[in-house]
């Protein structure tokens, strides 16, 4: 018996690993292997042809089924209260968003509902959404604040996010997005809101250990380039990496600014230009594509996928779960849309929810690949080929889900 396997607490025999290793072609597929876990990490990956018994006490034969890294949803807004279904109905009837917003709808309706909700209520609502992601193979999820827009309510959202990671079998990375919108209290003085973010909210979130990163919605209906830089400088003072909602509706040059700050990722990017692409390529910043928002908003301008590909910018894919522009709680659907709407290949979509998604969260040394030494977050699927994960939607193909070496689903 292989010595490394004998030291493992659990062994999965006869898995066909799609390793997603960058040094291997496409999905990084290997012949059937034994995968052993020790102390929450992948401790051994041994070809079945090299094995001889006896096996460790805790093993199971997966009969050649496909194994992949756990899926990573690296951009979500899944903590919120209230519903925007009525707004959706009005928009389908042709009512402009500006009119809906004037009547109290839009993002500020979500802000009011989220402020009014207790931590327990927000936890219950968000847990239901996360459980849907868990069922389709998500093992790590990023969750943003941004619907509180006061010091206490932003911290409330981040506390809920931390609780979700403690209570449910999923890794949670938190992002402070106080610069999501200007709250009504600061409507006539948005610069003062930016000062509040920089001088009060970022310090409080950092000192409480509630934020893993800081994000800004840099857009003509959001925050200017100068305001974004101000928030990034404050984040940098507290050692927090930055991210950005960039170039979704127009091109303000936010991606180049974010790249100058060594951002983990910039997201949306429908209006990204060549200068921005080169800045991302130069600094190795991840471009996160959000096809569900593109679909839901009926956008027509596509992100420059071919140019990103040519420049070797790493592309991630995420669900962007939120009540206003992407009420679609499915990373698998986002993978499909990334292929059908944006022109990614199924390989690129899979890399986008594993290896590159891990990089978008600063977790590329621990997550996103099947290799010895990585955290033991992996999935076993009842499907013939990894492309099925982007192709076939709505069918439960998940056989085994492992997080930190602990099995949380076995069919």
Curated annotation (Swiss-Prot):
Q: Which GO terms describe its cellular component?
A: cytoplasm
Which pathway does it take part in?
A: Amino-acid degradation; L-histidine degradation into L-glutamate; N-formimidoyl-L-glutamate from L-histidine: step 3/3
Where, in this chain's numbering, is N-formimidoyl-L-glutamate bound? 147, 322, 324
E.C. number, please? 3.5.2.7
Q: Record keywords: Methyltransferase included?
A: no
Q: What class of enzyme is it?
A: hydrolase
Q: Which GO terms describe its molecular function?
A: imidazolonepropionase activity; iron ion binding; zinc ion binding
Q: Which InterPro entries match?
A: Amidohydro-rel, HutI, Metal-dep_hydrolase_composite, Metal_Hydrolase
Q: What family is this protein classified in?
A: Belongs to the metallo-dependent hydrolases superfamily. HutI family.
> What protein am I looking at?
Imidazolonepropionase
């Amino acid at each position: 018996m292989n010595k490394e396997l004998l030291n493992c607490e659990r062994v999965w025999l006869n898995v066909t690993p799609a390793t997603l290793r960058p040094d291997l072609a496409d999905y990084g597929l290997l012949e059937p292997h034994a995968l052993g876990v020790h102390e929450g990490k992948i401790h051994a990956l041994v070809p079945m042809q090299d094995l001889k018994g006896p096996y460790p006490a805790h093993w199971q034969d997966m009969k050649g089924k496909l194994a992949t890294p756990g899926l990573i949803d690296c951009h979500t807004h899944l903590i919120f209260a209230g519903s925007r279904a009525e707004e959706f109905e009005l928009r389908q009837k042709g009512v402009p968003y500006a009119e809906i917003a004037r009547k109290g709808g839009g993002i500020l309706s979500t802000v009011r509902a989220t402020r009014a909700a207790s931590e327990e209520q927000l936890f219950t609502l968000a847990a239901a959404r996360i459980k849907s992601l868990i069922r389709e193979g998500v093992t790590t999820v990023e969750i943003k604040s941004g619907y509180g827009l006061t010091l206490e309510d932003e911290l409330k959202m981040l506390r809920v996010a931390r609780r979700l990671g403690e209570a449910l079998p999923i890794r949670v990375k938190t992002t402070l997005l106080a610069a999501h919108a200007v709250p009504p209290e600061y409507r006539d003085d948005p610069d003062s809101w930016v000062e509040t973010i920089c001088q009060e909210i970022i310090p409080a979130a950092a000192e409480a250990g509630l934020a893993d990163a800081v994000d800004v919605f840099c857009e003509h209906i959001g925050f200017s380039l100068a305001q974004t830089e101000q928030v990034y400088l404050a984040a940098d003072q507290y050692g927090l990496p930055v991210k950005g909602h960039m170039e979704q509706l127009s091109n303000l040059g936010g991606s180049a600014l974010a790249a100058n700050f060594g951002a983990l990722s910039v997201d949306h990017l429908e209006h990204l230009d060549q200068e921005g692409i080169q800045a991302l390529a130069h600094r190795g910043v991840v471009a996160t594509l959000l096809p569900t928002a593109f679909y839901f908003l009926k956008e027509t301008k596509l992100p420059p996928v071919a140019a990103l590909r040519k420049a070797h910018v790493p592309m991630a894919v995420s669900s962007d779960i939120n009540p206003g522009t992407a009420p679609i709680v499915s990373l698998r659907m986002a993978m499909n849309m990334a292929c059908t709407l944006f022109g990614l290949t199924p390989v690129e979509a899979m890399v986008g929810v594993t290896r590159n998604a891990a990089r978008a969260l600063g977790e590329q040394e621990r997550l996103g690949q099947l290799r010895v030494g990585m955290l033991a977050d992996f999935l076993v699927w009842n499907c013939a080929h990894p492309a099925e994960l982007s192709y076939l939607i709505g069918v439960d193909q998940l056989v085994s889900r492992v997080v930190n070496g602990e099995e949380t689903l076995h069919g």
